[in-house]
Structure formats: C-alpha cells, structure tokens
Amino acid sequence: MMLSVFKKKSCSYDVTIFQTPRFGEKKGYRAVYRTELNGSDHQDVLKRAFSLFNVFDTVPSDYDARFMATGDVILIDEGRKGKTYYQLLPAGWRKINRLIVQTT
C-alpha cells in the first residue's frame, strides 16, 4: 500500500457560504451558512461543499439558502493560518481578494 503513504491527511475546515439576496447580483453578499467540512485541501473542501449544497437529499436540514450557483463565495477559515475566499465561476472555483466580499 505505497499509495497511502503519499495521500494527504484529511482535516476539518471552517467553511462559510456567502450569497447575494438574488442570483446574479454583484453586491450585497451575506453569510448564509457556516459549517465544518473535512477534506485533504481547499480544492477537496470546495468540491465537497458544492456537492453537499447542490443535491437536495444531502443539503443540511438547517440550510435555508438557495443551491450554490455561479457568483457564490466560500470562505475557508483556518484560524492562525488565515482566511481564503473562493468564488464560483463557470470554469470552477477561483481564489479572490476578500475585499470583493462586502457584507451588509
């Protein structure tokens, strides 16, 4: 089992989802849900978040926001390691500057 030696260990990440009140808006992002997700790295967590919040049967019962869509933002907060924001674009997730997310 040499392959398992190189596999990155999964850990828990603090994840916050930001959405605008209406799909397609570019301002007014609000935090709509916060949770912890396990993953081996940021890309793994983003993949898991997209899957979790876009399949009706897997959405948590206390999640009141819409399904994730283009333009939505995810914050991954690693405490002392810092915060990283990602925006969902048609081509996938892109790291963004936190100044783009202006909460109201």
Swiss-Prot record:
Task: Report the Pfam families cross-referenced here.
Answer: YodL
Instruction: Identify the InterPro entries for this entry.
Output: YodL-like
Q: Would you say which domain of life the source belongs to?
A: Bacteria
**Name of the protein described by the UniProt record:** Uncharacterized protein YodL
- Source gene? yodL
